[in-house]
Amino acid sequence: MLPLLRCVPRALGAAATGLRASIPAPPLRHLLQPAPRPCLRPFGLLSVRAGSARRSGLLQPPVPCACGCGALHTEGDKAFVEFLTDEIKEEKKIQKHKSLPKMSGDWELEVNGTEAKLLRKVAGEKITVTFNINNSIPPTFDGEEEPSQGQKAEEQEPELTSTPNFVVEVTKTDGKKTLVLDCHYPEDEIGHEDEAESDIFSIKEVSFQTTGDSEWRDTNYTLNTDSLDWALYDHLMDFLADRGVDNTFADELVELSTALEHQEYITFLEDLKSFVKSQ
């Protein structure tokens, strides 16, 4: 309520005070109700399905299958399959990359489901960057401006960008230890790539792990950069940049991750459609 009162111009003075006194305050329960969270993926066709004449059929109890296959067939499943068919068609229409984009800098790409690994060898060192696209799309901001009534539905939908955390491993030839740097994209830096001398990613943690170990040990010392001296932090960022992990790399990784996430999302919709449709 206070932010609304601060918006009243001082010039209104006592008139605004009288107006506030004449209007009853809303119940506290309404003020404490959480604001609705926006859907990350705008299912535009869902509202059409929900308001259709077939809605009443979805509430009917399932009837035995007439074909004798023993499977469950409902009007809800039929409507679900039709919705998924339309949704898959729309997602493929807006898909930017039919194949995954390539990274510059001689990086080799290995993909295993939602996990991707980039490998590069430079002067006796092996650099590995690993990331996972699950839960990599940040939530939309509530403060974004609402589209005007004249805008099309396609223009109203925000473009989804995948910004996953990624881990950089640097291993020396014949070395027993691997330097591990845990990196992420700060939310306040997303969308400000063009600002001079601004890093669009940051180092969160640094540690040493035994080369060849499949699992990292929690007993190894881990350096958190939140309380780190800025001079040491800058040297760590320069260390990564000298090995090809810089702002250009981070930009291309976002593009690669976004394409992979969208590809996996479409595959998930297709699998979901096949699962619901199967007899």
From Swiss-Prot:
Ubiquitous. The modification N6-acetyllysine is found at K89, K92. Disulfide bonds: none annotated. Residues 134-162 are annotated as: Disordered. It is found in: Mitochondrion matrix; Nucleus; Cell membrane; Secreted. One of its GO terms (biological process) is apoptotic process. Residues 74-91 are annotated as: C1q binding. InterPro entries: MAM33, MAM33_sf. It is a peripheral membrane protein. Pfam families: MAM33. One of its GO terms (cellular component) is nucleus. The modification Phosphoserine is found at S198, S202. Its main location: mitochondrion. The modification Phosphothreonine is found at T211. Keywords: Acetylation, Adaptive immunity, Apoptosis, Cell membrane, Complement pathway, Cytoplasm, DNA damage, Immunity, Innate immunity, Membrane, Mitochondrion, mRNA processing, mRNA splicing, Nucleus, Phosphoprotein, Ribosome biogenesis, Secreted, Transcription, Transcription regulation, Transit peptide. GO terms for molecular function: adrenergic receptor binding; C5-methylcytidine-containing RNA reader activity; complement component C1q complex binding; deoxyribonuclease inhibitor activity; enzyme inhibitor activity; hyaluronic acid binding; kininogen binding; mitochondrial ribosome binding. Gene3D superfamilies: Mitochondrial glycoprotein (3.10.280.10). Residues 166-210 are annotated as: Interaction with MAVS. The modification Phosphotyrosine is found at Y185. Residues 1-71 form a transit peptide. Homotrimer; three monomers form a donut-shaped structure with an unusually asymmetric charge distribution on the surface. Interacts with CDK13, HRK, VTN, NFYB, ADRA1B, FOXC1, DDX21, DDX50, NCL, SRSF1 and SRSF9. Interacts with CD93; the association may represent a cell surface C1q receptor. Interacts with KRT1; the association represents a cell surface kininogen receptor. Interacts with CD209; the interaction is indicative for a C1q:C1QBP:CD209 signaling complex. Interacts with FBL and RRP1; the respective interactions with C1QBP are competitive. Probably associates with the mitoribosome. PANTHER family: COMPLEMENT COMPONENT 1, COMPLEMENT COMPONENT 1 Q SUBCOMPONENT-BINDING PROTEIN, MITOCHONDRIAL. Belongs to the MAM33 family. Multifunctional and multicompartmental protein involved in inflammation and infection processes, ribosome biogenesis, protein synthesis in mitochondria, regulation of apoptosis, transcriptional regulation and pre-mRNA splicing. At the cell surface is thought to act as an endothelial receptor for plasma proteins of the complement and kallikrein-kinin cascades. Putative receptor for C1q; specifically binds to the globular 'heads' of C1q thus inhibiting C1; may perform the receptor function through a complex with C1qR/CD93. This is Complement component 1 Q subcomponent-binding protein, mitochondrial. It comes from Rattus norvegicus.
